[in-house]
């Protein structure tokens, strides 16, 4: 059994977390602990991570933050939902041995 992790539970991450939770074991992670469901996070913390969904702000430290999150959760694959500059996915892919996927966020 594995879990998915959504990093960044804001405008983008919260709906992704809600949707994925319907079919998969999914936990949210955020620097603001009050946004996280600590009970769920603790319950599944020892499960391996299948997908790490990135929904954090694209600051100048974005790549470094993604690498830290990858080290923390050790996922099999990373999916970036944040709006990022061209070349960021390739830059991260060159530094990681797992697939890195960019999934553009689209409004309705």
Where are the predicted features?
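Rossmann-like NAD(P)(H) cofactor-binding subdomain of soluble oxidoreductases
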Residues: 51, 60-108
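NAD(P)+-binding Rossmann beta1-loop-alpha1 motif at the extreme N-terminus of oxidoreductases
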Residues: 1-44, 51
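Glycine-rich, highly charged phosphate/nucleotide-binding loops
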Residues: 36-45, 57-69
């Amino acid at each position: 059994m594995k879990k998915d992790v959504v990093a960044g539970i804001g405008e983008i991450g919260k709906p992704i977390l809600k949707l994925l939770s319907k079919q998969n074991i999914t936990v949210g992670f955020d620097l603001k602990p009050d946004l996280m469901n600590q009970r769920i996070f603790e319950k599944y913390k020892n499960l391996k991570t299948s997908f790490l969904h990135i929904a954090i702000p694209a600051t100048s430290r974005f790549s470094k933050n993604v690498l830290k999150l990858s080290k923390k959760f050790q996922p099999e694959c990373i999916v970036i939902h944040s709006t990022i500059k061209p070349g960021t996915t390739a830059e991260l892919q060159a530094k990681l041995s797992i697939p890195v996927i960019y999934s553009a966020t689209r409004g309705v």
